[in-house]
Amino acid sequence: MNLSNLQPAEGSTHNQNKRLGRGEGSGKGGTSARGHKGAKSRSGYSKKIGFEGGQMPLQRRVPKFGFTNINRIEYQGVNLDNLQLLVDNGIVTDTVDMAVFITSRLATKTEVVKILGRGELKAKLKVSAHKFTATAKAAIEAAGGEAIEL
């Protein structure tokens, strides 16, 4: 290495953008590349989101549709592999009910629980929940357990 091939470290330097409004001699003084007059030249200007220059904007051209069903029930899903994990960790042995879901943080007190069929269940369990999928119910009964709907 010698003085003819010195270079700054990688990433230590970057090109600075030309500063605006710092005198005519800078090439970007005066109007600061904003042109003359008008709303766009003023400070604080920002184009409104969705504004299309006075044309009817897309969100008003497209019709509304659908509604929110106030009677919809939001289920908290718990899979079979979660139940098997509770058995493997020694948290449950024979019955799984809402108290177990709450203590193991799989659901809260106010949530409605639905047992889903992902994974496999090897243990014989008596499971109490609000709803079961067909595959989950079949898997619980195939393992010798019982599926009780609350």
Swiss-Prot record:
The keyword rRNA-binding applies. Gene3D superfamilies: 3.100.10.10. Keywords: Ribonucleoprotein, Ribosomal protein, RNA-binding, rRNA-binding. The keyword Ribosomal protein applies. It comes from the Bacteria. Residues 1-15 have a biased composition (Polar residues). GO terms for cellular component: cytosolic large ribosomal subunit. Residues 1-52 are annotated as: Disordered. One of its GO terms (molecular function) is rRNA binding. Residues 23-32 have a biased composition (Gly residues). GO terms for biological process: translation. Part of the 50S ribosomal subunit. PANTHER family: 50S RIBOSOMAL PROTEIN L15 (PTHR12934), LARGE RIBOSOMAL SUBUNIT PROTEIN UL15M (PTHR12934:SF11). Belongs to the universal ribosomal protein uL15 family. Binds to the 23S rRNA. This is Large ribosomal subunit protein uL15. It comes from Flavobacterium psychrophilum (strain ATCC 49511 / DSM 21280 / CIP 103535 / JIP02/86).
